[in-house]
Amino acid sequence: MSVNYAAGLSPYADKGKCGLPEIFDPPEELERKVWELARLVWQSSHVVFHTGAGISTASGIPDFRGPHGVWTMEERGLAPKFDTTFESARPTQTHMALVQLERVGLLRFLVSQNVDGLHVRSGFPRDKLAELHGNMFVEECAKCKTQYVRDTVVGTMGLKATGRLCTVAKARGLRACRGELRDTILDWEDSLPDRDLALADEASRNADLSITLGTSLQIRPSGNLPLATKRRGGRLVIVNLQPTKHDRHADLRIHGYVDEVMTRLMKHLGLEIPAWDGPHVLERALPPLPRPPTPKLEPKEESPTRINGSIPAGSCLEPCAQHNGSEPASPKRERPTSPAPNRPPKRVKAEAVPS
């Protein structure tokens, strides 16, 4: 549970702004905004989604800074509520909608701050996914960097040894690597994984549309990645119930439950949300399915650049690293703005934890 995850982190005073009031768009305005989102998705050639804890609350996993989030309740001296475990949590409508958007070629890359493993367990291809803060179900060999996707949480946090050894052999007949396996969960001051951050940065810079779902964008550098899309002339859509750090940069802001927004989006695009049939790991994306017929998305009078008084696409933005003293200190270490792209994919082995 995110409660146990949060409790396992080192003490850290500045967790950002917690418990901000939620905003709900009226039904007609919500429908109009989702219509605009569908038009943007269909007309864009390189769409990148960025997800946060808000997309998993419908599965019973609490978020962190929402009205009943883990850290919000902690600030109030109250115990957070939870309804499930990481192992028993099921992917939400949003998780499964993202799977289908990738299958038909409308989603090029997915960047996630979540550690709950639901993207991988939903069947989203790992070669199109960057998990910037780790995955509770994944451990990695410290020697050869092979990753193992388990069917239960690995049991440690903070890049610590899990007590298991790597079983991969470099070639037939050779002995196993036997390197020490470690969890992939970051603590506050740990550096983000180089490969995942490089891929996320490259995808964000190449995107002509970045869409954030269920994140307040307060954690750096993860929360600043969507701004790379804006600096390159792309558009930014923010879907969140609470105000976010980068609202002023958004071309379109949608205040509604993420599952409702994604369900309406899929309907406008003429796509079905697939049912989840149990956890399975997909290492590489399959050939894309045929796109559905072009939806009826004729232009409306009000463009997304004017909704909520947002700034037009292409306007000058401040650099990601520029912050004033009023913003929370960075819980994640800053990285160069242009890390080396096109790193080779990690070797991955999926198996159950030995009994």
Swiss-Prot record:
Homodimer; binds to nucleosomes and DNA ends as a homodimer. Interacts with RELA; interferes with RELA binding to target DNA. Interacts with SMARCA5; promoting recruitment of SMARCA5/SNF2H to double-strand breaks (DSBs) sites. Interacts with the mTORC2 complex; preventing the ability of SIRT6 to deacetylate FOXO1. Interacts with the CLOCK-BMAL1 complex; recruited by the CLOCK-BMAL1 complex to regulate expression of clock-controlled genes. Interacts with CSNK2A2; preventing CSNK2A2 localization to the nucleus. The modification Phosphothreonine is found at residue 294. Residues 287-296 have a biased composition (Pro residues). It comes from Macaca fascicularis (Crab-eating macaque). Residues 27-272 form the Deacetylase sirtuin-type domain. It catalyses: N(6)-acetyl-L-lysyl-[protein] + NAD(+) + H2O = 2''-O-acetyl-ADP-D-ribose + nicotinamide + L-lysyl-[protein]; N(6)-tetradecanoyl-L-lysyl-[protein] + NAD(+) + H2O = 2''-O-tetradecanoyl-ADP-D-ribose + nicotinamide + L-lysyl-[protein]; N(6)-hexadecanoyl-L-lysyl-[protein] + NAD(+) + H2O = 2''-O-hexadecanoyl-ADP-D-ribose + nicotinamide + L-lysyl-[protein]; L-lysyl-[protein] + NAD(+) = N(6)-(ADP-D-ribosyl)-L-lysyl-[protein] + nicotinamide + H(+). Residues 284-355 are annotated as: Disordered. Keywords: Acetylation, Acyltransferase, Chromatin regulator, Chromosome, Developmental protein, DNA damage, DNA repair, DNA-binding, Endoplasmic reticulum, Glycosyltransferase, Isopeptide bond, Metal-binding, NAD, Nucleotidyltransferase, Nucleus, Phosphoprotein, RNA-binding, Telomere, Transferase, Tumor suppressor, Ubl conjugation, Zinc. It is found in: Nucleus; Chromosome; Chromosome, Telomere; Endoplasmic reticulum. Belongs to the sirtuin family. Class IV subfamily. This is NAD-dependent protein deacylase sirtuin-6.
